[in-house]
A protein has these predicted regions:
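A domain-start/cap signature at the N-terminus of enzymes
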Residues: 23-88, 169, 174, 234-245
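Short alpha-helix in the alpha/beta-hydrolase fold that links the catalytic acid
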Residues: 104, 218-235
Length: 285
């Protein structure tokens, strides 16, 4: 090959090698960034419901390895996209709202899940439908709370709960086991079945409300629970002013129910969902 031809061949080969190198060093195409994990439920853990009621998706099921299938209704504001932390509210119903009474029956029997929306429009509301008011349901409530705290963008300082009647029994057991999961608790027309010491240790504010002549429980168990927590706080050295910020005892007289058209003090517990002083206290914590 002549010198000139050899030179041209060398230049051509070098140019081809440079071109191949440029192609191989080009940045690979970028994959789209997946949405944050907190914006949607884990499909492997949850079967989503297909029915709705006034903004709630009904009969979702959390499949817990330890606690079995946990049925719940949930309201997630349309504005929630996982980019900012939202509050979280659990409302546990009385006997008439348990799962065997029918899907969504708790939302038809009680208004807590609806009136709560007036206090914070950036709040996810969970309305479980459990099967009893004992240890099993308490453990399922804890598992459900842990699921929402782990899979949604939740402000840990704004995690609220109420329990009405049997739901209050369940929620008091939860408070006796894992009070640190919650910011404040509203105990309505019920009795306290859980331990007291964990509540005192965690300094969880509790509001007790019941009719003075509640037909199912009477007001005595509520008074006793308040007194027990109060005594423990005194032992801890808290002042009355400090205790008053953590404990509220609100025993309603007969007129409270009669004036609002309720013939029953126990059944009239749903009135508490519409009481701005009570609900305002909960969501003001």
């Amino acid at each position: 090959m002549a010198p000139l031809e050899r030179l041209l061949a060398f230049v051509l080969a070098a140019a081809m090698q440079t071109g191949l190198g440029a192609c191989s060093s080009a940045a690979p195409p970028q994959e789209s960034t997946p949405p944050p994990a907190e914006t949607q439920p884990d499909d492997s853990l949850v079967t989503e419901g297909t029915q709705t009621d006034r903004g709630f998706v009904l009969d979702n099921v959390l499949h817990s390895e330890a606690e079995g299938d946990i049925h719940y209704n949930v309201y997630i504001p349309e504005t929630y996209d996982g980019s900012e932390p939202y509050a979280l509210y659990f409302t546990l119903p009385g006997y008439e709202g348990l799962y065997f009474q029918g899907v969504g029956e708790n939302l038809r029997q009680e208004d807590f899940g609806f009136t709560a929306q007036q206090y914070n429009d950036r709040m996810i509301i969970v309305a479980p439908q459990l099967s009893d008011w004992g240890e099993t349901s308490a453990d399922q409530t804890i598992a459900l709370a842990e699921y929402f705290l782990g899979h949604y963008n939740i402000d840990p300082d704004k995690v609220y709960a109420n329990g009405y009647s049997g739901g209050g029994e369940t929620m008091s057991l939860v408070m006796g086991k894992r009070p640190e999961l919650f910011t404040a608790y509203l105990h309505c027309s019920s009795r306290w079945d859980g331990a007291y010491e964990p509540v005192v240790k965690s300094r969880i504010p509790v509001y007790f409300v019941i009719g003075e002549s509640d037909e199912y429980y009477g007001s005595e168990p509520t008074q006793e629970a308040y007194d027990a927590l109060h005594a423990l706080y005194v032992q801890e050295g808290l002042s009355e002013e400090e205790i008053d910020r953590l404990l509220v005892l609100d025993i309603k007289d007969a007129a409270y129910f009669e004036e609002q058209g309720s013939p029953s003090q126990h059944g009239g517990g749903n009135l508490f969902a519409h009481d701005a002083q009570i609900m305002g206290w909960l969501f003001g914590q």
